[in-house]
């Protein structure tokens, strides 16, 4: 494997001799950023048996002593890197103050957006005036047709969601997708759940909605609140649950315009679509069709006035952070403090950086990469990605449950994976995004409108395979099945995930598992529905499909049994894709690591073998503390399992982990060999 040397400490250079008689000593090799070889040994609780509770064995000392910052709802390796990314971007913004940017440049737009965000006095001075035009338009609605015009406008809340993506039937072109939308709380369970906690959330939401109506000067805030919540509860009743939304086949319903009118007749699409800039579009993909058809009927069964109150509330709530402090505080109190347990608001500059990421993120990313991303890191990651792909290819050859016909298709798909590392080869053009100094509210909305118009303009054009769905300064990675691409932004390519000076086992267990995770998504419960071109196509034989489903059912049961809070258990079906990515990624990374050794034994370092260091690194990148409300929110809304599950359950299904730590029958984490899930 080519990557073994690249993952080791880079070669050292000799200093020039100080004198002919006495040569200077050789420079020390660069050291790992964390510990002596890339692992935080002080975080471990060695009083815990690894076979009883591996996550706490690796992270227990840290978990016992860590104090959650008041402005955080969770904190771990991802969060620490996100803090660093924010600080790096903030430093860029501070540098811009010393050199006025060129007129019309991306830098000027960034500066004007950020300065407008930071000028709280100007925001307070404008009061609710920026909302007046929207509230007047909403108040003027009298008929269902008026409502349809409003909900067709992407600037207003709507039970009809729109997004544009490559077409699952032909991924070389774009298609308009129509999906369920319109709730003020995260998902349907917050409206329909039966527990004291859900009752408390609903009461807090009622308080929040009432506060917003008071702030916009509504004549009857309490009555208006009742109308909004009643309407949203009816909408929640017809929404699909998150696990249903993962069904690729059920959410792929291609229709032409006539078929759309028949499928969802309560909407006058000839009125709705032109308002969204889609008047000429003839073909669509409908996602949750029953939720959409039943939700649209509420336009007939609910009074026009109830919808007007709904729209008025949401135009204020959705833009609360661009309005005076009273709006911002109310939004924080409910969405951050009540729903996720955050004690205090984050510093305004940090939220300003977050705002810029959402509106002009690639423009900021170009500046970020130029200053903070070493070109050599991209080359090293490119090689590591190639190593993981080779490891996946080796694993595909030996999968006993997969027949040859399906294996050939899987190999073909793996061979066409398109990895992107660091940053895009071309940067987004923000010329059409107009930013005016001193107008935060308008600038934020203009940014959203710019992005929607940019997407609409792509309809009828070939799919742009060079486009990125994340900014370089984002600490994350993703797989897109419609283009068969895996993407690793620059910001995640730092310790503890990637450190060219760390022990190779650490890099393979950390960033290697992340790379493998994204590759694994190409073959998870959703990704396996797409072929090597990104088209939805069944390339599985019935026999292999049955064996896959048998294994995934066993895997789901392991996560169903993971209950981090009383009455709060992971939904193994909802989190299946991410769980499969975690297991497959760890398996691939381990295979790549062993291949990199070329048949030799890894050295023992600080008493740990290479295999042990590999698994320790994986569990340590998932080290995280999280508040109870945030954890409950994650289980309900996020297809990723909690960190403690991600850093322990995959290991329990790998024979190599048992061998590395001497885990045996009788240990609490032990799973009999016949019950271990063996997929990728």
Model-predicted segments: where are they?
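Bacterial signal peptide processing site
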Residues: 19-21
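C-terminal motif of bacterial Sec signal peptides marking the signal peptidase cleavage site
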Residues: 14-17
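N-terminal low-complexity, Pro/Thr/Ser-rich intrinsically disordered segments
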Residues: 23-40, 44
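Active-site-surrounding "flap" and adjacent substrate/cofactor-binding loops of secreted or lumenal enzymes
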Residues: 30-35, 48-122, 185
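Intrinsically disordered, low-complexity linker/terminal regions across diverse proteins
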Residues: 28-30, 263-266, 285-289, 346, ...
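Bacterial N-terminal signal peptides that target proteins for export
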Residues: 1-7
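Noncatalytic, helix-rich "gating/capping" subdomain that lines the substrate-entry/channel surface
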Residues: 96-387
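Sec-exported extracytoplasmic/periplasmic mature domains
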Residues: 55-63, 83-86, 90-98, 115-123, ...
């Amino acid at each position: 494997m080519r990557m073994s040397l690249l993952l080791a400490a880079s070669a050292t250079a000799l200093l020039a001799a100080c004198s002919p008689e006495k040569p200077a000593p050789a420079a020390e090799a660069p050291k790992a950023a964390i510990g002596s070889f890339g692992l935080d040994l002080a975080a471990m609780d060695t009083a815990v048996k690894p076979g009883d509770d591996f996550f706490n064995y690796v992270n227990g000392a840290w978990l016992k002593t860590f104090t959650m910052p008041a402005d955080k709802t969770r904190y771990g390796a991802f969060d620490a890197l996100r803090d660093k990314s924010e600080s790096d971007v903030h430093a860029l913004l501070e540098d811009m103050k010393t050199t006025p940017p060129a007129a019309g440049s991306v830098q000027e737009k960034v500066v004007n957006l950020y300065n407008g965000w930071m000028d709280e006095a100007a925001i307070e001075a404008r009061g609710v005036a920026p909302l007046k035009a929207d509230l007047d338009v909403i108040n003027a609605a009298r008929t269902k047709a008026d409502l349809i015009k409003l909900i067709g406008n992407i600037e207003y809340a709507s039970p009809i969601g729109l997004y544009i993506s490559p077409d699952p039937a032909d991924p070389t072109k774009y298609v308009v997708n129509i999906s369920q939308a319109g709730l003020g709380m995260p998902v349907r369970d917050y409206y329909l759940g039966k527990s004291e906690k859900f009752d408390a959330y609903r009461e807090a939401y009622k308080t929040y909605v009432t506060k917003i109506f008071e702030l916009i000067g509504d004549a009857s805030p309490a009555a208006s609140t009742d109308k909004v919540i009643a309407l949203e509860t009816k909408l929640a009743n017809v929404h699909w649950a998150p696990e249903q939304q993962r069904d690729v086949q059920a959410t792929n319903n291609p229709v032409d315009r006539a078929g759309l009118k028949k499928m969802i007749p309560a909407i006058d699409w000839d009125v709705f679509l032109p308002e969204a800039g889609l008047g000429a579009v003839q073909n669509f993909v409908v996602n949750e069709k029953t939720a959409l058809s039943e939700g649209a009927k509420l336009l007939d069964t609910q009074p026009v006035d109830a919808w007007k109150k709904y729209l008025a509330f949401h135009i204020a709530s959705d833009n609360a952070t661009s309005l005076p402090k009273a709006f911002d505080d109310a939004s924080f109190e409910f969405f951050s403090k009540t729903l996720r347990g955050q004690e205090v608001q984050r510093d305004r500059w940090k939220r300003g950086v977050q705002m810029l990421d959402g509106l002009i993120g690639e423009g900021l990313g170009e500046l970020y990469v130029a200053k903070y991303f070493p070109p050599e890191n991209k080359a090293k990651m490119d090689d590591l990605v190639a190593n993981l792909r080779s490891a996946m290819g080796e694993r595909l050859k030996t999968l006993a449950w997969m027949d040859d016909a399906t294996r050939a298709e899987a190999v073909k798909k793996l061979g066409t994976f398109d990895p992107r590392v660091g940053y895009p080869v071309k940067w987004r053009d923000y010329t059409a995004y107009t930013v005016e100094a001193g107008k935060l509210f308008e600038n934020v909305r203009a940014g959203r409108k710019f992005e929607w118009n940019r997407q609409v303009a792509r309809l009828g054009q070939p799919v742009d395979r060079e486009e990125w769905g994340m900014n370089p300064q984002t600490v994350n990675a993703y797989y897109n099945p419609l283009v068969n691409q895996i993407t690793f932004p620059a910001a995640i390519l730092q310790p503890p995930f990637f450190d060219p000076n760390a022990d190779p086992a650490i890099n393979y267990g950390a960033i290697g598992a992340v790379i493998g995770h994204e590759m694994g998504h190409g073959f998870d419960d959703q990704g396996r529905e797409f072929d090597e071109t990104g088209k939805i196509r069944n390339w599985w034989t019935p026999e292999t499909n049955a064996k896959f489903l048998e294994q995934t059912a066993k895997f789901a049961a392991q996560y169903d049994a993971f209950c981090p809070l009383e009455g709060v258990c992971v939904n193994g079906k909802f989190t299946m894709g991410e769980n499969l990515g975690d297991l497959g990624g760890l398996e691939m990374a381990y295979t790549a690591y062993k291949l990199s050794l070329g048949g030799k034994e890894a050295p023992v370092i600080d008493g740990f073998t290479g295999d042990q260091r590999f698994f320790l690194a994986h569990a340590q990148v998932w080290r995280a503390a999280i508040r109870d409300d945030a954890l409950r929110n994650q289980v309900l809304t996020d297809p990723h399992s909690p960190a403690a599950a991600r850093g322990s359950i995959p290991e329990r299904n790998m024979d190599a982990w048992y061998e590395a730590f001497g885990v045996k029958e009788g240990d609490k984490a032990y799973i009999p060999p016949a019950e271990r899930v063996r997929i990728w």
